[in-house]
Amino acid sequence: MKDKRPTKRFAAPARAGRPLRPQQLLILAYAAAVIVWLVYVLVGSAVMLNHKADGTMVTRTLTADDLEFESFVNYDDDEWHTAPVDEPGWYLSTDNDPHIIWRGEAWLETVELDAVHYLPPGSVALYYLCPGQTEYSETQKVFARVSGENQYTFDLGGLTVTGLRIDPDSVGGVPTRLDGVVLNPVQPWYLRFVPNGGQWLLLLFAPAVGAAFACLAVDVFHKK
């Protein structure tokens, strides 16, 4: 016998305003982070090209003649100290806060210190002055990342400086051979798209934290 009960021809419509699942929020958060990073790099590249065009951004190698040294002894000029290696260009730090100072104005993205340390140097840091400033401070301090053999790179991010102070060691009594300080060293263009250590941490964890807070906000909103 034929069943005459009414049948459902169409499925029930999906509930309007259905919240996104946590996985979807997480994907959206990371996609937004990638877009923000690309915009940041492209804007920074445009600013860099503008400074190159007007001549305020140049690549320059500073030698010992361009720099001032504080709390250093030059082995070449001191008969009481003997360099660990029989070659010129070696300095000895006389306390735990030696300084290499450059006085000048430039627009800088990165600074590279090429130096050989005969002993472990501890931390290597750079301080910078902005226009109108005369005193170095901890708020304008950049720690070095080791970018090659006897090579330390400081990422300033693109700003105008009127002076630099490099602290090549933090322990004192370290023989150091200074091979040069390079302002805005030439780098492959694609490296601009590669985040540094701190930026990697931000890109990895900030979207996850943002997605978690978004999930909590959605739950609270739909419970009301």
Question: Where are each of the predicted segments found?
Answer:
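Short, conserved beta-strand segments of beta-strand-rich sandwich/propeller modules, principally
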Residues: 110, 161-163
